[in-house]
Design a protein with these regions (language model features):
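Low-complexity, acidic/polar, glycine-enriched regions of mature
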Residues: 20-188
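Bacterial N-terminal signal peptides
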Residues: 6-17
Length: 188
């Protein structure tokens, strides 16, 4: 009976080991960064936004999931100063754009991952902005407790309409392109 019990325990241990270890890697929000870039017919603007919390789920040392929260009230414009900077930050936070009083947080939930090569992943996730969730796909590189990604987000899918040719005609040089870029650096 002792041999049977020992054998059973050994098989269970091997089975659990084969399933692999799952661990959560929490980000350090102070050392992580999100840089955004939005373009219009006559130029572009860029800035930052703060990530408040998040983690990657690792299975057998491979990314298997993750969840991140962004503070939309922290929208910061880097390319302007003074009055113009304040006006643009206020406008981006208004109902014309991201309605941060109603929707102070944005979330990204990783749904699927595929390793393309060591430390490089293709990620499928759900992004929620203004209470609207849409799928997004992007690539992520992770090495030495740092993950980096670039996402292209179509703002029109999140009801961010101001200056968009998707919703308004004859905007001419007042058009703001629907796609904007975010460069993300996460430190764990």
């Amino acid at each position: 009976k002792t041999t049977t019990t020992t054998t059973l325990l050994l098989l269970l241990a091997l089975t659990f080991n084969a399933w692999g270890q799952t661990k959560e890697m929490s980000i350090n929000p102070e050392e992580s960064s999100i840089h955004w870039l939005a373009k219009k017919v006559t130029g572009q603007h860029d800035g930052t936004i703060k990530i408040t919390s998040g983690s990657l789920t690792m299975q057998n040392d491979l990314i298997s999931g993750g969840n991140f929260e962004v503070d939309m009230t922290s929208i910061f414009v880097s390319d302007l100063n003074g009055e113009y900077k304040q006006k643009l930050e206020g406008h981006l936070k208004s109902d014309d754009f991201f309605s941060v009083d109603k929707f102070p947080k944005a979330n990204l939930l990783i749904k699927e991952t595929r390793q393309k090569m060591p430390n490089h992943y293709e990620i499928n996730a759900d992004l929620t902005i203004k209470g609207i969730t849409n799928p997004v796909s992007f690539e992520m590189h992770i090495e030495d407790n740092v993950a980096m990604s670039k996402l292209i987000i179509d703002r029109s899918k999140f009801d961010v309409r101001y200056g968009s040719n998707s919703f308004f005609e004859n905007l001419g040089d007042k058009t703001i392109y629907d796609d904007f870029e975010i460069d993300v650096t996460l430190k764990f």
